[in-house]
Every structure is written in structure tokens, then in C-alpha cells.
Amino acid sequence: MYKQVIILRNDLKMGKGKLVAQGSHASLISFLNTQKNNPSVAKEWLNEGQKKVVLKVNSEKELFEVFRDANIDGFSCCLIRDAGHTQIPSGTATAVGIGPDKEEKLEKITGKLKLL
């Protein structure tokens, strides 16, 4: 089974709408990266129902660590930075999207994180 993981910063205290928007950016960009780099995985994930899991980190440092680990392990991923139009300053790192990819592979990086 395939899934996509979206990681959001809990320390920023973003409103619900802002959280959803940042997570949506991460989901879409990460999917597009997967579709470009590994189209068979993207297609399989679409056919399986697009499973997603949303997790949280408590700092920018933690977010960067997860992003670094995903890159090192060769996952299609993205780091989202806010445009600064509403609640938080421009350039603030808010979210990471990873995959889709095999669930068991993603667990090695994200298994220690808690659900949002």
C-alpha cells in the first residue's frame, strides 16, 4: 500500500484554515514531484484511493530534520514556506510533504511523529 505523509508545525499556532492550506500545498507539490520522478508510484497511489496521514512537529528544527531525512532516503518531497499574506511572516517554513510512497518505507522516517 502507498500513502502520502504531510507534516505540519504545531508550534506556529496557525488557525485551522491556515493549517489546511499549508497541508494542501505540501500534498499537491509532493504529489507532483512524485508524478514527475516516479509516475508508476503516483498512478498506483491514485488507484488505491490517495491515502494521506497528517503528522505534527513542534519546531522548525524538527521540520527541517524530517525534510533532510526524506531527501537523504530519496523520497519525493517538498518544504513549504508561507507567502506571509496573513498569519505568519513571509518565508516561514510551515509544512513538509513526503510521497506518496510505500507505507513501510515512510514509517522509517515518520513513525516516531504524532498525528496532528
Curated annotation (Swiss-Prot):
It is found in: Cytoplasm. The keyword Hydrolase applies. It holds the Pfam family PTH2. It catalyses: an N-acyl-L-alpha-aminoacyl-tRNA + H2O = an N-acyl-L-amino acid + a tRNA + H(+). Keywords: Cytoplasm, Hydrolase. Its main location: cytoplasm. One of its GO terms (molecular function) is peptidyl-tRNA hydrolase activity. It is an enzyme of class 3 (hydrolase). GO terms for biological process: translation. GO terms for cellular component: cytosol. Its EC number is 3.1.1.29. The natural substrate for this enzyme may be peptidyl-tRNAs which drop off the ribosome during protein synthesis. Belongs to the PTH2 family. This is Peptidyl-tRNA hydrolase. It comes from Methanococcus aeolicus (strain ATCC BAA-1280 / DSM 17508 / OCM 812 / Nankai-3).
